[in-house]
């Protein structure tokens, strides 16, 4: 169980230029869950994932099966980030050899199968890959480390819709019952049939947490749930257009 209690993160200097990013987040994620983490830009999604990984300092507690996340259990977590964590000049074959030692549960068969699926070359430096290929390689590494909890932050930015759709199908087929995925993305419709649970962040706080099954029973899809939790105004577009096209609008000389 990944447990987050009263998680708080403030950027800047308190009392001078402080900017709250997380405000008392409470969240529990059990092994085997597929969780979608949603929210507008600046909601705190990336900050939350980085706090879990120990990449940022924070107030509150984060534990794995009751133990704090330390060097002793960090291998139970992996991270795929659109900021990229791989070595740009080390080939995929070199990454495989490098990762085998610190990650004793390295999944060689999965690594090779995903490299073949995305048609990525084993002996070409990933720094020369396209943006989409770099993100693919980042995801492959995260899925091959043998981690129990796989955290993903906008993993398929720069990838076409066909690659994304096919990959989610492959992912559902290869994940073991004990593997957990926490996926941060804006692509709600694409992941609706992949995730089993939706967690919504807004201004650094959890404003919604439900299972996709519960939404279906309520006759709602994921987009409707997000709009409801966010208080979305359906007439905002028409109001903006009315203002922009109203007669007598002053023209700039």
What does each model-identified segment do?
Residues 38-40:
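The feature captures the beta-strand-to-loop junction immediately N-terminal to the Walker
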Residues 60-73:
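Conserved ABC transporter NBD signature motif
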Residues 81-137:
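ABC-family P-loop ATPase nucleotide-binding domains
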Residues 150-154, 159:
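Catalytic Walker B motif of ABC-type/P-loop ATPase nucleotide-binding domains
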Residues 164-177:
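Helical segment within the ABC ATPase nucleotide-binding domain
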Residues 213-253:
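ABC ATPase nucleotide-binding domains
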């Amino acid at each position: 169980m990944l447990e987050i209690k009263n998680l708080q993160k403030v950027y800047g200097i308190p009392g001078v230029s402080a900017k709250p990013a997380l405000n008392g987040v409470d969240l529990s994620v059990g092994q085997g869950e597929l969780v979608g983490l949603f929210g507008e830009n600046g909601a705190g999604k990336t900050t939350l994932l980085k706090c879990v990984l120990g990449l940022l300092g924070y107030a509150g507690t984060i534990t794995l099966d009751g133990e704090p996340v330390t060097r002793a259990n960090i291998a139970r977590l992996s991270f795929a980030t659109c900021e990229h964590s791989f070595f740009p000049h080390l080939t995929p074959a070199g990454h495989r050899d490098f990762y085998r030692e610190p990650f004793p549960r390295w999944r060689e068969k999965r690594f090779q199968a995903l490299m073949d699926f995305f048609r990525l070359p084993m002996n070409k430096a990933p720094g020369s890959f396209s943006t989409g290929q770099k993100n693919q390689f980042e995801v492959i590494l995260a899925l091959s480390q043998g981690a129990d909890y796989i955290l993903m932050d906008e993993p398929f930015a720069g990838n076409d819709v066909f690659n994304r759709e096919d990959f989610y199908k492959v992912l559902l087929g290869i994940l073991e019952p004990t593997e957990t995925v926490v996926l941060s993305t804006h692509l709600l419709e694409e992941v609706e049939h992949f995730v089993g649970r939706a967690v919504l962040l807004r201004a650094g706080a959890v404003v919604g947490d439900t299972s996709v099954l519960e939404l279906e029973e309520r006759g709602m899809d994921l987009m409707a749930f997000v709009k409801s939790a966010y208080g979305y105004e359906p007439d905002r577009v028409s109001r903006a257009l009315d203002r922009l096209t109203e007669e007598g609008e002053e023209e700039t000389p």
